[in-house]
Amino acid sequence: MKARKGQSSWRFYKNAWIFLEESKENLLSEEEAKSILKEKGLMVRNTYDFDTKDNTSFWFIIKDKLEDISELPASTRTKIRKALKIYNIRRIELDELESVAYEIISSAEKTYKIKESSTSSLDYVSLFERFRERDNCECWCVENKTNGEIVGFSINYVKADSCDYDYIKCKDEAIHNSSYPFYGLFYTMNQYYLGEKKLKYVCDGSRSVTEHSNIQPFLEHNFKFRKAYCKLKIHYKWWLGVVVKLFFPFR
């Protein structure tokens, strides 16, 4: 995911330009979109009117209120406490994380409901190179207190008043052995960014098409994340726009 020159809030991802400051994004004019697409890419994903009261077809999953642990569901509280007895949730440098993350990613990908191509060793190197290119990345890990094994991690992108939980993985066996690593990880990060750092909100991304990991419903149910609705306009490269109109004339 690379930044657009001169526009640090834009990132290029899978042939599309995406604005990372979702709460500050405005509706682009056709000329502005064309200017962005002159560089490269097939489309610009333009979201605007962030956190509108209208229930639109697109949203971001955010948490903007930090409640006491007693306000979370009883089962969630139990799992958080068990996770924190088993695991040390701590900050970790990107270089240290890179040395252990490949095994975690490979294990996590086996559990996805919708199978995508697995992350190869070359993809892995490229992935961490992209993270190094980004400013304000912070990494967290889930470390077993007994043997020191790192079973999960999160790579976050910290912005002026919010934080994106950008890339999160956990070993399949740790998820299914009743040690609840995700519960400890999300609880600790929420406490840090919303409580200690006083950010306005944390975000786990936008509407998922594949929902291969069920992470967004998990966060809504267990940690009181919510949908921040917004409006969406896709600006296409001119020739792709023609194709889209031919095949989907009423959209």
Residue ranges, per PLM feature:
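Short alpha-helical interface elements
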Residues: 105-108, 126-133, 181, 217-218, ...
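Terminal substrate-recognition subdomain of acyl/acetyltransferases
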Residues: 1-27, 34-43, 48-86, 201, ...
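A conserved beta-strand-loop-helix scaffold within acyl/acetyltransferase catalytic domains
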Residues: 1-12, 47-52, 62-176, 193
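Well-ordered, non-membrane alpha-helical segments in soluble/globular domains
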Residues: 26-34, 121-127, 182-188
